[in-house]
Amino acid sequence: MKMKRYYSFLLLGAVLSCAPTKEEPVLDKLPYFDLKGFIDLEINELEGDSVLKISEINGEKQTQELRYTVKDWKEEFASFYQADINVPSLVTAYDTRTTPDQLIHELLPEAKGKVKEITIRYVQNYPAWVMFRIKDENMFYQSTTLGELFMNQVTGKIDQYKLETTQKVMFLSPTHIKISGVIH
């Protein structure tokens, strides 16, 4: 009798575990600049290109000449992907301003979000410069990241990028990380 009851609960658990999960809704129209889509589009153009990469951690520099695949570029630009703000929970969280050559998304003071600002500068209606600021903090940890991406106006491809991060964990010294790359 106990075995029969055990198998009944096991079967019920298996059936319930197969129930469809609630997925995050997909936005019909993106409310903000499509940073993720832009990066995806641009890194496909960089397949096999080489980059002179300078990494600096707490003042210690390392310079490398590297050749990246699309997968490598996606990893290199992970911070840019993290700065994408086109998610349903942030649909009303940003103030959007425009000038003749810029689009600026800035987190509203009462809104919660890690991405504080995204600025896109346009030349001939195409992004020439993209910048984002991320700040994440809690009682034990604080992190700020500034990212910039520059487009070559002649080739129409990503020309340079910069990432600067400062991480501070309670009771430890801050870690300063700078990464820059010149693509050729």
Predicted regions and their residues:
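Post-signal peptide N-terminal segment of mature Sec-exported envelope proteins
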Residues: L27-G48
